[in-house]
């Protein structure tokens, strides 16, 4: 069902942006295996703020069976009201269900293996995760793709390249965005649509 929804969304995205006969998603352009990753944080500065949620979807291009990882992460400081309003993540949720950053990162690094990582905004997410990996004495050396960068090259001149805006143009349900796993689903669709438009991944 996930690939069916993806293909439908890519067709809609293609029509919206190109105003001509829609392109069918060419999933052969995608890596055979890749991991879509999204995080939620307490702010924008990786030197001051912390990860509070990690979501990842390990995609098998030639199968409809994908595996997911979802982890709430306990920060050292309380979550601001603004972040709770944006993500729906509360201090109570983190106290009850969150794990330490070391445990969360070890689980994440095991999950991703050496697969390509796909983010919507790679400089943001990857910087936070690289810094967190250093806390457990690890490095992230996986190849990286940025759906945001690909979208800017695929569809220049848009008013907004926010994930919800791009996904909404494709007719996707964006309710629940700003939670990590939901954003992974949206990112995967935008990534596939941009790859189809560009004729390649990057």
Show where each model-derived region lies.
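Transmembrane helix interruption/hinge and helix-loop junction motifs
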Residues: 1-3
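Acidic two-metal-ion nuclease catalytic site recognized across multiple nuclease folds
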Residues: 6-12, 19-26, 169, 188-202
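Conserved non-catalytic scaffold segment of RNase H-like nuclease domains
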Residues: 13-17, 21-142, 156-160, 164-178
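Short, glycine/acidic-enriched loop or turn micro-motifs at the edges of active sites
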Residues: 41-43, 149, 186
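Short Asp/Glu-rich motifs
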Residues: 103, 152, 186-187
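Conserved beta-strand -> loop -> alpha-helix junction used to position metal-binding or nucleic-acid-contacting
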Residues: 139-151
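A charged, well-structured terminal subsegment
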Residues: 174-196
């Amino acid at each position: 069902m996930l690939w069916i929804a993806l293909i439908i969304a890519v067709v809609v995205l293609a029509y919206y942006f190109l105003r001509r006969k829609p392109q069918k998603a060419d999933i052969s352009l995608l890596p055979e295996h890749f991991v879509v990753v999204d995080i939620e944080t307490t702010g924008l500065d990786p030197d001051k703020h912390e990860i509070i949620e990690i979501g990842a979807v390990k995609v098998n291009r030639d199968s409809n069976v994908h595996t997911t990882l979802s982890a709430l992460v306990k920060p050292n400081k309380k979550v601001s009201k603004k972040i709770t309003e944006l993500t729906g993540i509360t201090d109570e949720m983190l106290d009850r269900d969150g794990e330490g950053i070391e445990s969360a990162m070890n689980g994440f690094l095991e999950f991703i293996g050496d697969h390509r990582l796909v983010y919507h905004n790679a400089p943001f997410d990857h910087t936070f995760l690289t810094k967190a990996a250093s806390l457990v004495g690890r490095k992230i050396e996986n190849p990286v793709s940025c759906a945001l960068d690909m979208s800017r090259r695929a569809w220049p001149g848009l008013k907004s390249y926010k994930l919800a805006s791009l996904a909404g143009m494709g007719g996707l349900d964006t309710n629940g965005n700003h939670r990590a796993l939901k954003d992974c689903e949206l990112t995967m669709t935008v990534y596939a649509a941009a790859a189809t438009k560009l004729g390649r991944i990057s």
